[in-house]
Amino acid sequence: DNKYKARIKILVKALTPEVFAQKVEAEFAHTIKTLKVDAETLAKMDENFTPFAYQDYQDQDFTELFAQHPKFKHWFNINTHAHKVKGYRIVTISLKRTGVAPGDVTSEEMNLIADLADQYTFGELRTTHEQNIALVDVPQKDLFALWQALDQANLARAHIGFLTDIICCPGGDFCSLANA
């Protein structure tokens, strides 16, 4: 192991898992006692998170579209999730496919996803810890058009949360930490 790479696995191996766990628990116990955030600090932090100007959309009835387009129904059920605002959904775009390192996306695909974020959301996309991309504020009325654009670009793979949505290291060819 390379001790100059900041990796938890190296620390755990040096300390032993038991000692590492004890140190984590001790730090947590100390932090939970000393961490105090007052209302003024919370209000100041809240100023940094201006809410988007959501439209007053209604939830959509996709019954007819689901009957006509079973692939859309499958994608909707797997790759979209409830949103806190009525009439919106969160869409997860899978970056997993055969023959490509998980999470890899070409510049053309990323430009397309950015354009779709501009067209169908507030211009925001997020990378996820699952090595995917999320469009978090998609109006339900635009889901079918978004799915069609993703499908045309081979980005509408419906396997979020399944074994094929694996999270893994892309290996030494792509990551300097692969051999740490």
Segments (PLM) and residue ranges:
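Peripheral terminal and linker regions in Fe-S/redox and tRNA-modifying enzymes
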Residues: D1-A180
